[in-house]
């Protein structure tokens, strides 16, 4: 009793007994179900296929570059050759670009080209149009050809140009008219025919560069009436300011000179000369007043560090009061020099530019 009470009081032992009974009943039921099911016939084994049972192709679909023909596989028939292809792949082998020294039809079996001329029809020749024209002219005994004869030479010697003639013939005409090395020669009276001849310039060797003629456009005709030389262009300036160096007598100064201007023949003289004389006379009066002021001037006075504008206003008033027209003066009177002293730079600047201010500090450092 005590033993039974201990067994029933242990819950884990009871669970183990229940699980053992459950698995015993499940295995017994599964065996009974297997005995009641009918026996199915076993499926026949799949037939085996070998590489030798495939029919050999008519030709090898692969193109090999300079490679030998493929023979039977040593793993199948014991022969020598590539071990990766079955028997039958070497009979109709086609080779691509086998090693050969010459060009022939057998070298390119994938191209339906019977001869070399048909191949040249597909490839454009490596020559410019100027080179084609030069070759056609040089290969004739007379060294001259008409435009139609140049067309015929190019089409006969270069089969590529037999098609689409409109395009390259237009380029031939374009190069003939724009290239300086091609010269047009008129026909003789006793030479019947149509069109002028074209020949090569004797100096065309200088235009020849690496087998191609350099394209040069013809120069335009000189402009009518442009016969003035450089000297005449310089004479067009009626007035000129020349700066004398410090080594010249009188020190550095600015000299106003009047250059003579001669109008070309057959043309009316320009009124620039009279205007220049008026301007030079006005400037002469202004410069003379400046010299008088400089010779009798007092030392400069500075006020509050600013420039003095009174003199500049006086100069502007005198410049505005100059007459527009005045009688002509001699060449000696037109040469007026500024005051030559050690302050000539500032004085000449004041003469040329009336708007410039006086220096705040003198060159000696005076304040």
Curated annotation (Swiss-Prot):
DNA-binding residue intervals: 124-218
Start and end residues of each stretch annotated as Disordered: 31-51, 224-254
Keyword annotations: Activator, DNA-binding, Nucleus, Transcription, Transcription regulation
GO cellular component, one term: nucleus
Main location: nucleus
GO MF assignments: DNA-binding transcription factor activity, RNA polymerase II-specific; RNA polymerase II cis-regulatory region sequence-specific DNA binding
Cross-referenced InterPro entries: Fork_head_dom, FOX_domain-containing, TF_fork_head_CS_2, WH-like_DNA-bd_sf, WH_DNA-bd_sf
Keyword rRNA processing assigned: no
Subcellular location: Nucleus
Gene3D superfamilies: Winged helix-like DNA-binding domain superfamily/Winged helix DNA-binding domain
Comp. bias intervals (Low complexity): 31-40
Single Gene Ontology BP annotation: regulation of transcription by RNA polymerase II
Pfam family, one: Forkhead
Annotated function: Possible transcriptional activator.
Name the UniProt record assigns to this protein: Forkhead box protein I2-B
Taxonomic source organism: Xenopus laevis (African clawed frog)
Phylogenetic placement of the source organism: Eukaryota, Metazoa, Chordata, Craniata, Vertebrata
């Amino acid at each position: 009793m005590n033993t039974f009470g201990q067994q029933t009081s242990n819950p884990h032992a009871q669970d183990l007994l229940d699980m053992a009974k459950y698995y015993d009943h499940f295995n017994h039921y599964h065996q009974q179900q297997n005995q009641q099911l009918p026996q199915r016939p076993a499926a026949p084994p799949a037939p085996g296929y070998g590489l030798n049972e495939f029919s050999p192709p008519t030709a090898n679909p692969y193109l090999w570059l300079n490679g030998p023909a493929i023979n039977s596989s040593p793993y199948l028939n014991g022969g020598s050759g590539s071990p990766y292809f079955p028997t039958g792949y070497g009979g109709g082998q086609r080779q691509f670009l086998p090693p050969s020294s010459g060009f022939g039809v057998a070298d390119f079996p994938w191209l339906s080209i019977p001869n070399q001329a048909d191949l040249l029809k597909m490839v454009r020749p490596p020559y410019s149009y100027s080179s084609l024209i030069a070759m056609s002219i040089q290969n004739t005994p007379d060294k001259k050809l008409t435009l139609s004869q140049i067309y015929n030479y190019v089409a006969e010697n270069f089969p590529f140009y037999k098609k689409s003639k409109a395009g390259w013939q237009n380029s031939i005409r374009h190069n003939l008219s724009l290239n300086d090395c091609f010269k047009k020669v008129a026909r003789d009276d006793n030479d019947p025919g149509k069109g002028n001849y074209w020949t090569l310039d004797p100096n065309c060797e200088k235009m020849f560069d690496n087998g191609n003629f350099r394209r040069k456009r013809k120069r335009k005709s000189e402009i009518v009436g442009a016969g003035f030389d450089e000297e005449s262009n310089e004479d067009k300036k009626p007035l000129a300011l020349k700066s004398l160096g410090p080594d010249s007598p009188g020190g550095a100064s600015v000299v106003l000179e009047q250059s003579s201007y001669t109008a070309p023949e057959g043309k009316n003289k320009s009124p620039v000369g009279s205007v220049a004389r008026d301007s030079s006379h006005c400037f002469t009066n202004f410069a003379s007043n400046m010299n008088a002021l400089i010779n009798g001037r007092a030392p400069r006075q500075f006020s509050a560090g600013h420039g003095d504008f009174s003199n500049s206003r006086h100069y502007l008033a005198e410049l505005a009061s100059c007459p527009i027209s005045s009688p002509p003066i001699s060449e000696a009177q037109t040469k007026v020099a500024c005051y030559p002293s050690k302050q000539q730079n500032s004085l000449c600047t004041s003469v040329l530019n009336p708007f410039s201010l006086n220096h705040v500090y003198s060159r000696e450092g005076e304040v």
